[in-house]
Regions:
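Glycine-rich phosphate-binding segment of PLP-dependent enzymes
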Residues: 4-6, 18, 26-40, 47-67, ...
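Glycine-rich phosphate/pyrophosphate-binding beta-alpha loops
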Residues: 6, 11-14, 18, 182
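A short, structure-level motif marking secondary-structure boundaries and short turns
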Residues: 33-35, 144, 179-181
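Alpha-helix capping and helix-loop boundary segments enriched in small/acidic/polar residues
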Residues: 40, 145, 149, 182-186
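PLP-dependent aspartate aminotransferase-fold enzymes
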Residues: 47-172, 189
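Acidic, glycine-rich loop-and-beta core segments that form the ion-binding/anion-interacting portion
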Residues: 166-195
């Protein structure tokens, strides 16, 4: 019998048939089979990692699991800092995010978040975090600018910020493909290619 709360098991019966047996098996598995990814592996983790790698760009060979998006973004910041320290570039630590972007609510991830309510009363954003224009054409484009011109405007603003800060100090840019918390904002066509 699976070791899980009865309520959870009863909810599993309402899940699609293909999913529920696997979920019941996971709930009945020892915690090491699902939780301790640094010291143990499991069939479930190997299968999920394989599926993720099927979607990943060529050259990517590893999957890192975090507990949340905030945790994942915090880890990325640490990796950026570590990488530049190892290469002897301790000044290359600045990260550019976007206004209205959401990356978490911790000290660093809250700093990357481009929403003032996440900064108020917490002395955020932290040093080294900058915010560039949000790709919301309807609200952020100068009057009379079409979407194509706005894409160029966003890319130019980012480049100006990098040059103003000093390319030798800017380590990364972070942005969600589709901005959710900041207002369900879909960037105009061509935005990511320009960025």
């Amino acid at each position: 019998r699976p070791r899980a709360f009865g309520e959870i098991i009863s909810r599993l019966t309402a899940m699609p048939p293909a999913l529920s047996p696997k979920m019941v098996t996971l709930f009945g598995s020892p915690p090491k089979d699902t939780a301790f990814r640094f010291t143990h592996s499991s069939e479930a983790i190997i299968e999920l990692s394989s599926r993720i790698m099927d979607w990943a760009p060529e050259g990517m060979k590893k999957v890192y699991y975090g507990l949340s998006g905030s945790d994942a973004n915090e880890t990325q910041v640490k990796l950026v800092r570590y990488y530049n320290n190892v290469l002897g570039r301790p000044q290359k630590k600045k990260i550019i995010s976007r206004d209205r972007g959401y990356h978490g609510s911790g000290i660093m991830t809250g700093s990357l978040t481009g929403l003032p309510t996440f900064h108020q009363h917490f002395d955020l954003p932290a040093e080294g975090v900058k915010h560039t224009v949000c790709p919301h054409w309807y609200r952020k484009a100068p009057v009379g600018m079409d979407e194509s011109a706005f894409v160029s405007y966003c890319a130019d603003e980012l480049e100006k910020m990098i040059l103003a800060e000093g390319p030798h100090t800017v380590a990364a840019f972070i942005g969600e493909p589709l901005m959710g918390t900041g207002g369900i904002i879909v960037p105009p066509a061509g935005y990511w290619a320009a960025i």
